């Protein structure tokens, strides 16, 4: 993501949700107070300059960066094709909020992920009444949580689509199993 993307995302989310921008930019108790004070002066100035902007596309034009605009387009297109969306980070949440104001059903295709413990992300997830798929306590860059959650999502999809149901329980005779599965049978029998 680009420099300033979290601040831009905080402005977008603040305007669309009436959540105070300060709650979205504060990363945690260790954030430098002088840095926060300066940031708040700049962000409040941007909010004041665009105080009458409320429509999603206008909010995007006033506060969003290029990367947020691209994500809004990708989210809308992916949801229109019923693709799964992995949402990770404040800029992705801002893009999703904009997309949801344009076409609300996009949130039906979302799995929320988390790469760090930024307090502003807590506020953003609360706006969607969502929690992250996994809370790993990482302090990494946006997207890491989605990358780590992807294998879990793939496994869940496989369970839903590939596991035999009650009508077709699969092979009943060990001889009809592929070689690796036959070798695993004695090990499975030894488990408590």
Q: What do these predicted regions represent?
A:
Residues 1-192:
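N-terminal loops that bind phosphate or other acidic moieties
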């Amino acid at each position: 993501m680009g420099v300033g993307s979290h601040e831009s995302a905080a402005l977008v989310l603040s305007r669309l949700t009436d959540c105070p921008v300060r709650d979205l930019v504060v990363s945690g108790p260790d954030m430098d107070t002088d840095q926060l004070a300066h940031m708040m002066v700049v962000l409040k100035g941007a909010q004041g300059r665009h105080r009458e902007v409320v429509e999603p596309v206008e909010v995007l034009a006033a506060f969003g960066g290029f990367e947020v605009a691209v994500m809004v387009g990708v989210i809308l297109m992916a949801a229109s094709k019923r693709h799964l969306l992995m949402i990770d980070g404040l800029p992705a949440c801002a893009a999703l909020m904009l997309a949801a104001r344009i076409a609300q059903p996009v949130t039906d295709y979302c799995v929320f992920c988390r790469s760090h413990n930024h307090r502003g992300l807590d506020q953003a997830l609360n706006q969607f009444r969502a929690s992250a798929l996994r809370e790993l306590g990482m302090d990494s860059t946006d997207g890491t949580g989605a990358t780590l959650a992807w294998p879990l999502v793939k496994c869940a999809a496989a369970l839903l689509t590939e596991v035999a149901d009650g009508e077709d329980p699969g092979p009943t005779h060990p001889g009809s199993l592929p070689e690796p599965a036959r070798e695993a049978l004695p090990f499975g029998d030894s488990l408590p």
